[in-house]
Amino acid sequence: MNALITICIILFAAAYLASAEHKPFPAVMPLEKPDYPISAAMARLYDEWNPHEDRGNELYSNFKYSRLNGFAEKENVSRRDPTKVIKVDGIYHVWYTSRRTTHSPVGLKNATDTIPATDWDLSDLWHATSTDGFTWVEDTEPAVTRPPKPEQGFRSICTPGILVWEGKYYLYFQAYSPMVGGQAYCPVRVAYADSPNGPWTHYPDSVILPGPKGSWNNIKINDPCPVVFNDEILIYYKGAPIERGHEMVLRMQGVSKSKDPLGPFFPSPINPVINGGHETCMFPFNGGVAALVALDGPEKNTMQWSPDGENFAVASMIQIPPVAPGPYCPDAFARGKTDGRGITWSLCHINPDGGGAVSKSILARFDCDLSLDVDHQVLKRNNLRFNAQSYFQSGVGLPKGWLRRILKEQEDLDQETIIH
């Protein structure tokens, strides 16, 4: 009997001690990771995020969009893919792809020398200025026109990226000949000028070429995005192979480096440096390089950060990210050691009908708090809600024609609820 009593006392004491160790998680969020057992989810909060959630994350923001003034909307006039915005002598400058054709895009099979295949086909690079970032004055002629045939780019030049280096201005762009499209050869070319107002001169050679046969970017280099980091010119870009299929790379992002804006540029030996994304958006941030990654890949719709410009990690998950952002980032091309203060606003493009390749685009502005110098808590909210039309619009609602298919699948798949 005494032995039984002793065992009961030991078990009771063990249970008491165990319950004491498993204290409830407090209402006041601990700033340090607790030293008592917590769930895997709570451990991630401290190990990968921070106890203040998105409120305390400098690389988290919402994006608040505004229409721009000054860009007249006309039939078959498209504006898209803005560069970073720069400010020179009190004036903001931006360059962008613009298609001005007599016909809307018709796809690759039906395109002609005058009828575009895609929204960025038969395009030139245009320029606009502003004193406040909301109202813009567009030049009356293109800043950079397509080079003459048979030079690379005679079909279309598009998706420019601006670099300011040693007092000169460089516009990098993708150059298509003889046709645009996902399986058309596309290197990066560059034009240069002594002033943001031009005139611009085409450099005769391509400066970044697609990779070798069998590589991840063997057919095209798109969306060149220059950043100066550690006294080097880094040009980020989207790449893809000519081969298509579920087993192939769809699109990823890489980087090439140079000390000279006209090259040669050397690709990173660990390319691709981002495992997805569509249009590129990189800027100096907090001693490293930040990237806004959207639309494609397993880490889509995230902000990422790299200490060296090549090894990126997810820093936050974002909602309703901009398409083709071109941020105002005054230290994007700063030489020497710079900490990178981040961005508070940017231009981007929107397809009014929700399309992509075969519809026109407009430029828009968004404001955000991806900056070390401001603290806009309204832009740090993470509980965004939308009206009914947002859920039923094209691209989000169930596609037309699918109702019959869904009903047929339900007949085969939907079983009676299991009740014991």
Indicate where each model-derived feature is located.
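Bacterial N-terminal signal peptides that target proteins for export
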Residues: 1-5
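Bacterial N-terminal signal peptides
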Residues: 6-15
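Sec/Tat signal peptide C-region and signal peptidase I cleavage site
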Residues: 17-19
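Carbohydrate-active catalytic/glycan-binding domains of CAZyme proteins
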Residues: 21-420
